[in-house]
């Protein structure tokens, strides 16, 4: 049976965001306040970091800074790296993630499952060492550092989407 081309099927990118809001039912003390929480774990890569990862890559694409096939580089300790690995895989980018060796094996497995190349620095070097290596790789022409810690497109993912939701 042929697939109906007129039906639009959602992509992974379409599934980032629009996470449910839930009312927190048990608040300390006697209050009539209503507190809501966003279930960001419902994003495809499972965290609040899916939005900024998609934003950082999509905004760089829209500026023409990157095109599919390019190599992206990022220092990470976990969830941002997982989200970037997912987005890079979907959009056709190679991704090098640099992280301290003492991060969880589960996170490393997920990043690799999405196709990211992992480069570990010593635990002593930590995130500073990971960032420095990322910048060194970029200087050698090995790819573009997304630089989540100072990239204005990182919080834009929440400002433009999470907030209005």
State each model region's role.
Residues 1-165:
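PLP-dependent amino-acid enzyme catalytic core
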